[in-house]
Regions:
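Generic detector of leucine side chains in alpha-helical contexts
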Residues: 1, 13, 32, 39, ...
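Negatively charged, low-complexity tracts enriched in Asp/Glu with abundant Ser/Thr
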Residues: 1-20
Length: 92
């Protein structure tokens, strides 16, 4: 079981196609936190991945998720809207 603890709007104007995406933070039954982005980024193989982060606190999971997102968009300079996909609204 996981409980949604928080949802954050993250503004990133340099790489993201719309300047903003969301991160949800979940807490599991062991008290650990996981963050997931609602934006998915293409990798070198053409597969899409969302940013995922972990932590012992809500804040550390959020920071780790943002760091993972920035790592996902660091492998090339010129990003197009087609390089991103959005999670289903019902999933987020």
């Amino acid at each position: 079981l996981e409980k949604v603890i928080a949802e954050f709007d993250v503004w990133e104007l340099n790489k993201s196609p719309y300047g903003k995406f969301k991160i949800k933070i979940f807490q599991d039954t062991k008290g650990l936190y996981t963050g997931y982005s609602n934006i998915q980024v293409i990798d070198e193989t053409g597969s899409f991945y969302c940013a995922v982060g972990y932590g012992d606190t809500e804040e550390s999971a959020l920071n780790d998720t943002i760091k993972h997102y920035l790592k996902l968009v660091s492998w090339k300079e010129d990003w197009q809207e087609s390089d991103f996909e959005w999670s289903e609204g019902t999933d987020f």
